[in-house]
């Protein structure tokens, strides 16, 4: 059975005139196409009180919180993603957080972040048995992870790279699967587990 996943968007500006827009990277669309995934909608940065009706109308049963920007840079996005996480928690919906999205999942339960050096526009190993290297585009990392999460992967400098909730079907990673072509088999499974029930 397919699920409908709502994908968070980031604030972007029009070139040449003043207009705020909600957008996602085209890398996501390419990734979805390569995996034959078409059961998604974009989640514009609406007022939080509109979210439940929007999700009910579109039969949303999961969220993908994308990367981009630092938490607290776009307050409207922060509020909407917190509302989405509240809805997901109440209904036990699937959530996948990528980069900023993983930080948001941790923050939702009281986690904190801190700045980190050496994680922008680079690749580094994670501590899994395959000695996999992942891309890295972030300047913040999780500082204090709430007890309700377990760490799946860490980088060589001990930064948290991937987490999962101990009860809820929530997962997060700091790397960007949409930026690796072809997609790594591990990330392919991660995406399929979110988009297919």
Region spans (language model):
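DNA-recognition element of transcription regulators
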Residues: 136-140
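Active-site-proximal beta-strand elements of phosphoester/diester hydrolases
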Residues: 133-134, 171-175
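Conserved active-site segments centered on acidic
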Residues: 107-114
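N-terminal beta1-alpha1 cap of cysteine-dependent amidohydrolase-like domains
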Residues: 1-100, 114, 119-120, 127, ...
